[in-house]
Amino acid sequence: MSYVDEVYERVVNQNPGEAEFHQAVKEVLDSLKLVIDANEEKYRKMALLERLVEPERIISFRVPWVDDKGQVQVNKAYRVQFNSAIGPYKGGLRFHPTVNQSILKFLGFEQVFKNSLTGLPIGGGKGGSNFDPKGKSDREVMAFCQSFMTELSKYIGADTDAVSYTH
């Protein structure tokens, strides 16, 4: 079995149920296969692919916030800090009911490559929550976002993580 195939198999085994992440890793590894195979011993010794496919850190946290009826709601949130080899983690936030760790790992993994092409000293990451802004009042969205950032601020800093928001 080739080094690329071994690493992909390990990703699948160590990250069960994360189909989105598996697919992103497979596509990247497949595109690198010829280059990696030609220099397999060198890359294997450096554990290049293992370092490429494993996030540096995944932060999982809860976000309590109060809706317009005075009810406390709690959402699940994540920040995947994938790779800081060339600079602070950079990647947006996604708020959607389908957000889960697999989706954010997939997006953070791809963000590493996207950011590396800018020529700027920034790494890759992604964050988000299963919060659904659809049908929420402006006050509810603001309450959620303020709580999200309060909780996230415990784990990030100016030299560590550069968060951007897109919707």
Whereabouts are the PLM-identified features?
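Generic start-of-chain signal for non-secretory N-termini
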Residues: 1-19
